[in-house]
Amino acid sequence: MSKIYIVAYVYGVVQGVGFRYSTQRQAQQLGVTGYAKNCDDGSVEVVASGNPQAVERLMEWIRQGGPRGARVDRLLTEPYPPTPFETFSIRY
């Protein structure tokens, strides 16, 4: 099965609540690689690559609100250029 690559912009209460770390943990459990990064506008950018089912499960976890303390108001996704990621990291 081929990998898919997407970028997701997550809006709501997603900074200062452990969102990136929880997303990293969830991605690692699913075998998804990429990164999570806080954006200046208060959103979080999540780039995810992996098999389509695993990436969709990660996106569904985010859609449902992510970690305790977070609130996801909006999730926008779009294709991302194929990029080799070894792990799922947190970027600063």
UniProtKB/Swiss-Prot annotation:
GO MF term set: acylphosphatase activity
Catalytic reaction(s) noted: an acyl phosphate + H2O = a carboxylate + phosphate + H(+)
InterPro entries named in the record: Acylphosphatase, Acylphosphatase-like_dom, Acylphosphatase-like_dom_sf, Acylphosphatase_bac, Acylphosphatase_CS
Keyword check for Hydrolase: yes
Active site: 20, 38
Acylphosphatase-like domain span: 5-92
SUPFAM superfamilies, sorted: Acylphosphatase/BLUF domain-like (SSF54975)
Record keywords: Hydrolase
Catalytic activity, EC: 3.6.1.7
Annotated signal peptide: none
Stated family: Belongs to the acylphosphatase family.
Protein name stated in the entry: Acylphosphatase
Organism: Yersinia pseudotuberculosis serotype O:1b (strain IP 31758)
